[in-house]
Amino acid sequence: MTAGSPEECGEVRRSPEGRVSRLGRRLGRRRRPRSPPEPLRVRARLRLRSPSGAFAALGALVVLVGMGIAVAGYWPHRAGAPGSRAANASSPQMSELRREGRGGGRAHGPHERLRLLGPVIMGVGLFVFICANTLLYENRDLETRRLRQGVLRAQALRPPDGPGWDCALLPSPGPRSPRAVGCAEPEIWDPSPRRGTSPVPSVRSLRSEPANPRLGLPALLNSYPLKGPGLPPPWGPRTQTGHVIITVQPSGSCIEHSKSLDLGLGELLLGAPAARDCAHRSWPRLDRLSLGGYAKLGGGGDLGARV
């Protein structure tokens, strides 16, 4: 068992490897790159009930008629009866004249005319059929292009699928949450100023609504819950006159540095929110800074003289 096992195992191992390699090569040779599928498989039908279809049918009919004429010209006909030949062969002169007449008839007989006329009629019918068929396919291709353009326009005008396709019109209020792909998240009005930023409120979300111009500013203000110390609701009785005024009652002295913003939407005044901590502002105030250091530098004299 130990002596014959290596050779047998070697033979057993080689055979499946060889088979697998051959199968792999065969499969690799048989594989061919497939052409990508067409994005729009929209194709119009052939308009057979049209002038071009009628001419195509007429051409096919003419081809069949010419073919029948040619077959009739080449069809073998029987010769005359033997009794008539014996009666007509009594006079040698009449026989000679008839032979001459037969020779001329063979050259210009009805069978020869049919043989010449049949192919000509077939050619004319084939020409008409080819021209009409070409017009049929050209009309079908033109209609197919129009259908594809209509489908592309419909796909371009159709809103994207999903529950949040209208999020660009009325953004949902509240904190930021994962939204649908392709929907712009509205900016949240944070009353507390950040470091390196201006305390002026961001109004980008109020003016970035070009999709639906009918939605006025009251609808946008109603969609955003504006919360702050002493902030009255914007939907109070003051909105009945058509003017929306938003004011913020400050708790400190930082409100005097803010300025009103004119958005071009009537009389709209947006006061800057009160800052909780006035130590981190985007611009320094000279009246708030201690000018002691500047006085020391000014009254110290020349530094070179001291040295």
Swiss-Prot record:
It holds the Pfam family DUF2371. The keyword Iron does not apply. Belongs to the TMEM200 family. InterPro entries: DUF2371_TMEM200. It is a multi-pass membrane protein. This is Transmembrane protein 200B. It is found in: Membrane. Residues 10-20, 96-111 have a biased composition (Basic and acidic residues). Residues 1-38, 81-111, 180-211 are annotated as: Disordered. One of its GO terms (cellular component) is membrane. The chain crosses the membrane at residues 53-73, 116-136. Glycans are attached at residue 88. Keywords: Glycoprotein, Membrane, Transmembrane, Transmembrane helix. Residues 22-34 have a biased composition (Basic residues). Its main location: membrane.
